[in-house]
Amino acid sequence: NGSIPNPTTDEIMKIRRNHYTGVEQMIADLQMNIQYPVSPVLQAVLCRAFAEVMKLEAGELEINLNRLMNKGVYLLCWIQRYQNQLFKNWKKNDTGCFIHMGACQNVNEVLFMKFLARVPVDVLILCPDRNEHCMLEDTLLYEINYETSMKLDQFPEQNAQLHIGTAAYHAERELDTLMYNDSVIFRDQQF
């Protein structure tokens, strides 16, 4: 709902890292934090996707190595946090689903969505408010934009939070307006 909670201090401390002299060395070492012993095939896919998005990020801005490492640590924290939910009892050709409500608000979320787009996970990003700018752009993501917009702060868990009038409801309201406003006919006296 809105944004992915930032990694906690404990999650960050669990990520092994060293001092690096280059991007390739840093990516190779950081991806060793991705462990999924249940499926070596999936672990290889996760490592490859991590390396791919980190190289894309390094090439886009000619970013400073420490800043890139910080982004990598955030990404690894989120991978470790969500991998068991996304890949529980994973078998080849299984696909998890990650639903994000609202636009991606920071570069770390964008990086995580790019990562998820490269692993066996369907990524659904719902941005019902068209005035909210999403920072995410990726050729692997299919984007659909509708003309209507609505302000919705969090994902509706019960339908009590969201009410959309049907065509019949709006027709009834319009008929009420035409018949009962500025006339001598009153609804409560109608039989």
Language-model features, listed with the residues they occupy:
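Conserved N-terminal ligand/cofactor-binding loop architecture of enzyme catalytic domains
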Residues: 1-73, 140-191
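Active-site and donor-binding regions of nucleotide-sugar-utilizing enzymes
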Residues: 49, 54-145
